């Protein structure tokens, strides 16, 4: 009797998991997908610190926002070429694995990781390799687990890339302008508390403050969304974190003002709005993206097949049960 019950449980579990996962997904084919805000007809930049950040942390976001029917143009800006590697050595005396950090191009991975990022980006829906920009400036942006990047350097780079006329605007009364509408990056905890990740958050906020300096009467042309960091336990429960993130989003939407409710409806394109005299609804306070099984496999393949140099043993666990391979919830930052 017990063996029959165990067999039945093992047989039902995969089916139950598939049904649960399908219902939790937020894509257009999901039964619940249309109930969550998204972005349409936007110029979007994902700001990351290292090649593979886009696959290990932001795959659900990229796979969702690059859907052709949404009309978004997504780019990736990576501030290092990933020339830091971790070397794990078994210490025969203690029996423990010791981790050494190799910096510079001692690991010979710099040019390889640039190519891997481009391949991964295409698997995650970007239109072209030219939409991936990689900064190779170790003096300002060293790939290091201990170095904090200057927020002025990050902000200055963003300004030169997306608001080159910023200096001229500072002395005029015209509305601030930028060549992107949406900036995505890590939050202040950086998911893993990596100092490079956390530096992007502070640099991105400094960039928006620079855009608005002396322009308080105008709306900011760039909306900043940051990826929510979670507890250690939630990081490794995969799709089972979806209900938690959904509940958090619903509560936030209920008390977050009208912006989220307005953004629930599909808005017409900017050009159509201008012709009709329609004011574009404000961006949602929170965004939630939950991969379908197919999209999870796409993100999994982006990491496994594109970032081959990074597939050491402990990353297999992350891409298999890690919640960031399935669930992304992003919060709009008020600057």
Swiss-Prot record:
Membrane topology: Single-pass type II membrane protein
GO molecular function: N-acetylglucosaminylphosphatidylinositol deacetylase activity
Chief location of this protein within or outside the cell: endoplasmic reticulum
Glycosylated sites: 128, 153
Keywords: Endoplasmic reticulum, Glycoprotein, GPI-anchor biosynthesis, Hydrolase, Membrane, Signal-anchor, Transmembrane, Transmembrane helix
This protein's GO CC annotations: endoplasmic reticulum membrane
Family annotation (Gene3D superfamilies): LmbE-like
Residues in the signal sequence: none
Record-annotated membrane-spanning stretches: 3-23
UniProt-listed Enzyme Commission number(s): 3.5.1.89
Record field: catalytic activity: a 6-(N-acetyl-alpha-D-glucosaminyl)-1-(1,2-diacyl-sn-glycero-3-phospho)-1D-myo-inositol + H2O = a 6-(alpha-D-glucosaminyl)-1-(1,2-diacyl-sn-glycero-3-phospho)-1D-myo-inositol + acetate
One Pfam family from the record: PIG-L
Pathway(s) where this gene product acts: Glycolipid biosynthesis; glycosylphosphatidylinositol-anchor biosynthesis
Name this polypeptide is given: N-acetylglucosaminyl-phosphatidylinositol de-N-acetylase
């Amino acid at each position: 009797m017990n063996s029959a019950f165990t067999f039945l449980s093992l047989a039902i579990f995969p089916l139950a998991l598939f049904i649960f996962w399908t219902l939790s997904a937020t894509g257009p084919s999901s039964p619940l997908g249309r109930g969550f805000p998204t972005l349409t007809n936007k110029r979007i930049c994902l700001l990351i610190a290292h090649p593979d950040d886009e696959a290990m942390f932001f795959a659900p976001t990229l796979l969702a926002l690059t859907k052709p029917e949404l009309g978004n143009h997504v780019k990736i800006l990576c501030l290092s070429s990933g020339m830091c590697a971790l070397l794990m050595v078994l210490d025969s005396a203690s029996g423990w694995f010791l981790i050494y950090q190799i910096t510079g191009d001692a690991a010979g991975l710099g040019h390889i990781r640039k190519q891997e990022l481009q391949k991964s980006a295409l698997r995650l829906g970007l239109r072209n390799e030219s939409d991936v920009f990689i900064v190779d400036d170790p003096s300002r942006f060293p790939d290091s687990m201990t170095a904090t990047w200057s927020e002025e350097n990050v902000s200055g780079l963003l300004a030169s890339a997306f608001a080159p006329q910023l200096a001229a605007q500072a002395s005029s009364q015209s509305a601030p302008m930028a060549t992107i509408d949406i900036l995505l990056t890590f939050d202040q905890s950086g998911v893993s508390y990596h100092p490079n990740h956390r530096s992007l958050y502070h640099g991105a906020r400094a960039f928006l403050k620079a855009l608005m300096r002396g322009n308080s009467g105008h709306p900011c042309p760039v909306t900043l969304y940051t990826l929510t960091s979670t507890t250690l336990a939630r990081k490794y429960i995969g799709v089972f974190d979806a209900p938690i993130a959904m509940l958090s989003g619903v509560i936030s939407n209920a008390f977050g003002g009208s912006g989220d409710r307005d953004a629930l409806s599909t808005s017409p394109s900017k050009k159509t709005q201008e012709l009709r005299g329609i004011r574009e609804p404000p961006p949602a306070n929170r965004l939630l993206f939950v991969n379908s099984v197919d999209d999870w496999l796409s993100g999994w393949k982006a990491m496994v097949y594109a970032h081959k140099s990074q597939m050491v043993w402990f990353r297999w666990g992350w891409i298999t049960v890690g919640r960031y391979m399935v669930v992304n919830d992003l919060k709009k930052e008020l600057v």
